[in-house]
């Protein structure tokens, strides 16, 4: 009888242990899961660089990593881009640099063509989203330059996706900006209305 009691106690402890063990690793794994779409996107970005809007073919691939909201914003900005060229058929004005000289996921000017990336850290926000900090590198091997962006990742339909990119302030960039905001500059939904509209920034 004593042996049976010991066996029963052992089985009970074992079952309770199995029931509790997965909870802690699950919390640990969430930041790692949040990094997956970020690594996927930037791996493609450095292997085949994007300037301005991705082609429809490339956008289809990149959409795997993006939230439905960000995809919608990019599509509206592309429609606004087309509307701008419709309004300027003679091409007598320079198109907004956000469309032509800007890396949507990396930054403007000499930050548009990163050649390498490294995920540095991941932080959770109170709303359940994550910020994945990525260091990007561009320039010649003997003298490259680095900068950092914060990629906002959220859960959507059971998977993590990128919802925004924050271009962080540093010694070369005076103000912080967001991709979601830059996509709306000068636009009213899919129509170009100029920099004087409520969505525009100086």
Where are the regions that the model predicts?
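Bacterial N-terminal signal peptides that target proteins for export
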Residues: 1-7
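Surface-exposed, charged secondary-structure patches
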Residues: 67, 71-144
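Core segments of small alpha/beta cavity-forming domains
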Residues: 26-97
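Bacterial Sec signal peptide processing site at the extreme N-terminus
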Residues: 20-25
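Low-complexity, intrinsically disordered terminal/linker segments enriched in charged
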Residues: 126-148, 156, 161-202
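Hydrophobic/aromatic beta-strand elements that line small-molecule binding cavities or substrate pockets
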Residues: 119-121, 148-155
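Hydrophobic h-region of N-terminal signal peptides that target proteins for export
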Residues: 11-19
């Amino acid at each position: 009888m004593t042996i049976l009691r010991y066996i029963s106690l052992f089985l009970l402890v074992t079952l309770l242990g199995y029931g509790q063990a997965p909870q802690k690793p699950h919390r640990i794994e969430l930041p790692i899961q949040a990094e997956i779409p970020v690594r996927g996107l930037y791996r493609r970005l450095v292997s085949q660089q994007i300037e301005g809007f991705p082609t429809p073919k490339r956008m289809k691939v990149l959409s795997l990593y993006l939230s439905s909201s960000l995809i919608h914003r990019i599509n509206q900005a592309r429609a606004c881009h087309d509307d701008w060229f419709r309004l300027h058929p003679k091409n007598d004005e320079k198109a907004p640099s956000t469309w032509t000289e800007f890396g949507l996921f990396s930054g403007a000017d000499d930050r548009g063509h990163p050649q390498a990336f490294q995920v540095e850290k991941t932080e959770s926000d109170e709303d359940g989203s994550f910020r994945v900090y990525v260091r990007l590198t561009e320039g010649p091997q003997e003298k490259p330059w680095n900068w950092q962006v914060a990629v906002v990742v959220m859960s959507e339909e059971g998977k993590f996706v990128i919802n925004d990119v924050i271009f962080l302030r540093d010694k070369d960039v005076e103000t912080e900006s967001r991709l979601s905001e830059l996509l709306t500059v000068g636009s009213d939904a899919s129509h170009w209305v100029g920099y004087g509209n409520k969505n525009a920034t100086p």
